[in-house]
Amino acid sequence: MATGSHTTTLLLAVALLGLPWPQEAGAFPAMPLSSLFANAVLRAQHLHQLAADTYKEFERAYIPEGQRYSIQNTQAAFCFSETIPAPTGKDEAQQRSDMELLRFSLLLIQSWLGPVQLLSRVFTNSLVLGTLDRVYEKLKDLEEGIQALMRELEDGSPRVGQILKQTYDKFDTNLRSDDALLKNYGLLSCFKKDLHKAETYLRVMKCRRFVESSCAF
C-alpha cells in the first residue's frame, strides 16, 4: 500500500473509530496539528448531521406539517446560546481568533452534555435510536478534541469564565403531552443550530490554517 494511502486510512480510523486524543503535547505518538483539526471537524460534522436527522425524524413523527412554520418562528429566542457573543456565521467567525472560536465551540458542546442524556428515550421506536444512545459519548469525544486543540494553541491569554448563565432543560420523555412535544421540538432545533455553529467555527479555523480545496462551504 502506498504511504499516502496508509496515512489517509490511519487518520480516518482515528476519526471514525473514536480513538483517544493525545492528552499532552509530548504524548506518543504525536499527532500533527492538521490531524487534530481534521479529526475535530469530522466529529463535528457527524454530530451536526445526527442533530439535523434527529430533528427531521422528530418533526416527521410528531409535528403536523401545517404547524411547523409557525412553531419554528417562535423557537429562535429560546436558544440560550444566543445569549453569548459568539459569531452567527462563517463571515463573522473569520473575524475571530482561533482561541476565541475554540472557546465558543467548547461552551456550545458543554451546554448539551446534560440535556442529551435522555435523548435516546425520546426515540424509543426511531430509526435513529441506534446512534442516539451514544450521543453523549460523541459529545464528550468532541469536547476532548477541542480541549486538545486549545492545549496546542494556548496563546497565554486569560481564560474566559463561564459565559452561558443558563443551560438547556433535559428532553421530556412524556410524548403524550403536547407541551412536552413542543419543548423537545424546540430543544432539537437549538441542538441542531448549536452544532452547526461549532462545526462552522472548526471548519473556518482548519481552512485558514491549512489551505485546501474543500474550504468552500
UniProtKB/Swiss-Prot annotation:
Role played: Plays an important role in growth control. Its major role in stimulating body growth is to stimulate the liver and other tissues to secrete IGF1. It stimulates both the differentiation and proliferation of myoblasts. It also stimulates amino acid uptake and protein synthesis in muscle and other tissues.
Location(s), subcellular: Secreted
CDD domains: somatotropin_like
The name this protein goes by in its record: Somatotropin
UniProt cross-references to InterPro entries, sorted A to Z: 4_helix_cytokine-like_core, Somatotropin, Somatotropin/Prolactin, Somatotropin_CS
Binding site for Zn(2+): H46, E199
Main location (coarse class): secreted
Pfam families on file: Hormone_1
Any GO MF annotation of the entry: hormone activity
UniProt family annotation: Belongs to the somatotropin/prolactin family.
Transmembrane parts of this sequence: none
Cystine bridges: C79-C190, C207-C215
